[in-house]
Amino acid sequence: SLMVRLAADPSTALRLMAEYPEPFSACEVGEIMAVLRRGMLPIAYEPLIGSPSRNLRIVGLNIVRQFGIEEAERLLLRIVSGDEDPELVREALYTLCALRRPLTRRAVSGRLSAMPPAERKALLRYVVAEGYSPGPLRRLLDERERPYYESL
């Protein structure tokens, strides 16, 4: 129903997304991104990322990732270093990877070390898929993870 309402009146998109009662699923975010790519929802990423609404922040991060907006790096690092929502932090880390930004910063390494092992392993697979060289990232990996990362 959200997508129907967005299509009917795109000018209410931000309000509708912010008021949506449940966290967006990956499918819902994908549908919103498809509408954005078609140019039907003219939305800027910065107000979304800075919004108090979790759903708007997730959409903002996806806009940055999909459109390769490197200028958002400062906002991404702010989320990584200080946000309390683990899902937003994870999405910001994946977005930094998608933009191929340096991951050896203190904020990033601190969050990586605090991640649960399964999430950290998934992120390492994504880092490899994005083409990061193992050399500079060695200091982010503990001894057990280095062989796994290098085997990918």
For each feature predicted by the language model, list its residue ranges:
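Structural detector for internal amphipathic alpha-helices that build alpha-solenoid repeat scaffolds
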Residues: 1-8, 15-38, 46-50, 55-69, ...
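Core helices of alpha-solenoid repeat scaffolds
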Residues: 10, 38-42, 73, 105
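Alpha-helical repeat scaffolds
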Residues: 16-17, 45, 107-112, 137-145
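Surface-exposed flexible segments
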Residues: 73-74, 79, 138-140
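Helix-capping and short linker residues that terminate individual alpha-solenoid repeat units
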Residues: 84, 101-104, 116
